[in-house]
Amino acid sequence: MAIERTFSIIKPDAVSKNLIGAIYNRFESAGLKVIAAKMLHMSSEQAAGFYAEHQGKPFYDGLVSFMTSGPVMIQVLEGEEAIRRHREIMGATNPKEALAGTLRACFAESIDRNAVHGSDAPASAAREIAYFFSDAEICPRG
């Protein structure tokens, strides 16, 4: 199996509920290592740029507004099949459809306030990691 990196956001709703540690525990229990992390309060420009692919969609303005409503925790995760594993841990985008025990089933409020974000493919992971982290900020743990 291939060692991959993926990008992850703990969104404002989960940060405000003090769920960072619980979510990190799930990542690490699944064999994913945090190799870069920082807390930030996204500016409108950062959020708009990050979610540029959704511009023009009905939910775009609300998404940018939500993602700038409070601090987020962003991280790079590394491990075997990290993208697939992370997406399994997160669960379906709509928490009503998420399997029991997934992050969204446990912690999400709604499809709009769904606790976490994760890259969906290697290309998006590379783009999203580079959007927020320089190479010098990433610390492989072997």
UniProtKB/Swiss-Prot annotation:
Keyword ATP-binding: yes
Sequence positions that bind ATP: 11, 59, 87, 93, 104, 114
Lineage: superkingdom: Bacteria
BP GO terms, sorted: CTP biosynthetic process; GTP biosynthetic process; UTP biosynthetic process
Cofactor(s) required for function per UniProt: Mg(2+)
GO MF terms, alphabetically ordered: ATP binding; metal ion binding; nucleoside diphosphate kinase activity
Primary location group: cytoplasm
Any single GO CC term annotated in Swiss-Prot or TrEMBL for this entry: cytoplasm
Reaction(s) catalysed by this chain's protein: a 2'-deoxyribonucleoside 5'-diphosphate + ATP = a 2'-deoxyribonucleoside 5'-triphosphate + ADP; a ribonucleoside 5'-diphosphate + ATP = a ribonucleoside 5'-triphosphate + ADP
Subcellular location: Cytoplasm
Active site per UniProt: 117 (pros-phosphohistidine intermediate)
EC number: 2.7.4.6
CDD domains: NDPk_I (cd04413)
Coiled-coil features, chain-numbered ranges: none
PANTHER family xref list: NUCLEOSIDE DIPHOSPHATE KINASE (PTHR46161), NUCLEOSIDE DIPHOSPHATE KINASE DDB_G0292928-RELATED (PTHR46161:SF3)
Record-linked NCBIfam families: PRK00668.1
Protein purpose: Major role in the synthesis of nucleoside triphosphates other than ATP. The ATP gamma phosphate is transferred to the NDP beta phosphate via a ping-pong mechanism, using a phosphorylated active-site intermediate.
Subunit structure comment from the entry: Homotetramer.
Family: Belongs to the NDK family.
Name the UniProt record assigns to this protein: Nucleoside diphosphate kinase
